[in-house]
Design a protein with these regions (language model features):
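A short, exposed loop/beta-hairpin motif centered on an aromatic-Gly-Thr core
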Residues: 45-64
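Short N-terminal "domain-start" leader segments
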Residues: 1-47, 69-73, 77-83
């Protein structure tokens, strides 16, 4: 797992996930072995792990454009968990 943003700069929000409170990140540009995408990570039991993948796989640059595009245009800027 790789991130385009430093872990300490990622914003997290506590949510109820199936009856358990966990910390889920704002949408971020991240990568797995399959490629780059916009997704979220969570903090659970002291570990950082993938939480969800919101887009298909693409280049790092394309994923950053999707993240920076306003939500009303199909991107993630303005997402409730995203930084204001």
């Amino acid at each position: 797992m790789e991130f385009a943003k430093k872990i300490e700069d990622i914003n997290f929000e506590k949510i109820n996930s199936y009856g358990e409170m966990i910390e889920v990140s704002e949408p971020i540009v991240m990568a797995s072995a399959a490629g780059w995408y916009v997704g979220a990570i969570c903090k659970e039991d002291g570990f950082i792990q993938p939480y969800d993948r919101y887009t298909e796989y693409m280049t790092k640059e394309q994923a950053q454009v999707v993240l920076d595009t306003p939500e009303e245009e199909g991107g993630f800027k303005g997402h409730p968990f995203a930084e204001a």
